[in-house]
């Protein structure tokens, strides 16, 4: 059993993009699906599908690459960890990497990006960053 499903998922995405794989498989969790929806919306992944196999669900992710074959994921980091939670207020969630990167924040209004959290005037737990 994986202790930190978000860190495991981000590591699998990072490893698959470095190896230039087209697809990768992640463990299913609602929080992982919420993060993947943000990644898809921002163009870091092409698509993802949830599949059932022997009463266990998996998420299959199709990675996105540019026309030269480079991955759209340059770096992905887990910021808040089970042993050390990181929380930020609204005014600490401004632009990241001059708008090229995204910070994923878990708020009372759901899992959203740092820019949406700033617009909605909410803070929360900083889950991960990607650029």
Curated annotation (Swiss-Prot):
GO molecular function: rRNA binding; structural constituent of ribosome
SUPFAM superfamilies: Ribosomal protein S8 (SSF56047)
Function: One of the primary rRNA binding proteins, it binds directly to 16S rRNA central domain where it helps coordinate assembly of the platform of the 30S subunit.
Protein family: Belongs to the universal ribosomal protein uS8 family.
NCBIfam families: PRK00136.1
InterPro entries, per database record: Ribosomal_uS8 (IPR000630), Ribosomal_uS8_CS (IPR047863), Ribosomal_uS8_sf (IPR035987)
Record flagged with keyword NADP: no
Oligomeric and partner information: Part of the 30S ribosomal subunit. Contacts proteins S5 and S12.
Protein's recorded name: Small ribosomal subunit protein uS8
Protein keywords: Ribonucleoprotein, Ribosomal protein, RNA-binding, rRNA-binding
GO (cellular component) term, any one: ribosome
Pfam families: Ribosomal_S8 (PF00410)
Any single GO BP term: translation
